[in-house]
A protein has these predicted regions:
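Active-site-proximal, glycine-rich beta->alpha crossover segments in alpha/beta enzymes
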Residues: 1-60
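A non-catalytic, amphipathic alpha-helix used as a structural packing/dimerization or gating element
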Residues: 38-60, 64, 87-94, 162-169, ...
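Alpha-helix-loop-beta-strand connector modules within alpha/beta enzyme cores
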Residues: 1-6, 81-105, 140-145
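Glycine-rich, proline-tolerant flexible connector loops at the mouths of alpha/beta enzymes
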Residues: 12, 65-85
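Catalytic-face loop-and-helix region of soluble metabolic enzyme cores
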Residues: 100-175
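Distinct, well-ordered alpha-helical segments
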Residues: 19-26, 81-85, 116-122, 139-141
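Histidine/lysine/aspartate-rich catalytic loop segments that bind and position anionic ligands
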Residues: 34, 74-75, 134, 141
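A structural motif
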Residues: 5, 65-66, 125, 144
Length: 175
């Protein structure tokens, strides 16, 4: 159902995050089944299959009114940096390129990734979502695309003054 005069965001999990859930059959908490990393060929084949189905899902969302797509890689932080090219950068770049080929902007959220700058330079999203463990001043200095997020959700349940203080801090940094 398309909403007239309303912008909507389509959401997909990144191939790596979906694979993590498939391996663990639940939220991995802070680790992933170590034995799985022994077969790099298998991992890459599964990531390609996931990517293929995500493209179908993305296209369906766009055809049904999504004006932007956000790719969540909730478990990017589980990997070591040496594994980013195969498991994070390449599959996500393929999806970003696909979304852009449909003339739709794309936001990426590589949660807890250790190098947001490198991610943005390689994957080239239109915007990036950051998690609250990231120093916003470092992001502001190093990333030249729109940034969203970064505020610890726990701030939302504190008093109004603390919430206002944290929001103003972010506004000052990103102005």
């Amino acid at each position: 159902m398309q909403l007239k005069n309303k912008n909507t965001i389509g959401f997909v999990g990144a191939p790596w995050t979906l694979l993590v859930y498939m391996i663990n059959q639940q939220s991995p908490k802070k680790n992933v089944e170590k034995n799985f990393f022994e077969d790099d060929y298998l991992i890459n084949r599964i990531l390609l299959i996931i990517e293929k189905f995500l493209k179908i899902h993305i296209k369906n969302q766009i055809e049904n009114g999504a004006n932007v797509i956000q790719i969540f890689d909730s478990w990017a932080g589980l990997l070591e940096e040496k594994d980013y090219p195969n498991y994070i950068y390449t599959p996500t770049l393929n999806l970003v390129n696909y979304v852009k080929s449909l003339n739709v902007p794309v936001i990426c959220f590589p949660r807890e990734i250790k190098n947001y700058k490198e991610f943005c330079e390689i994957v080239k999203p239109d915007a990036v979502n950051i998690d609250y463990n990231v120093d916003p001043s470092m992001i502001c200095k190093n990333i030249k695309i729109p940034v969203q997020g970064g505020l610890d959700p726990k701030v939302l349940i504190t008093d109004k003054e603390n919430l206002k203080k944290q929001v103003l801090k972010y506004l000052d940094i990103f102005r």
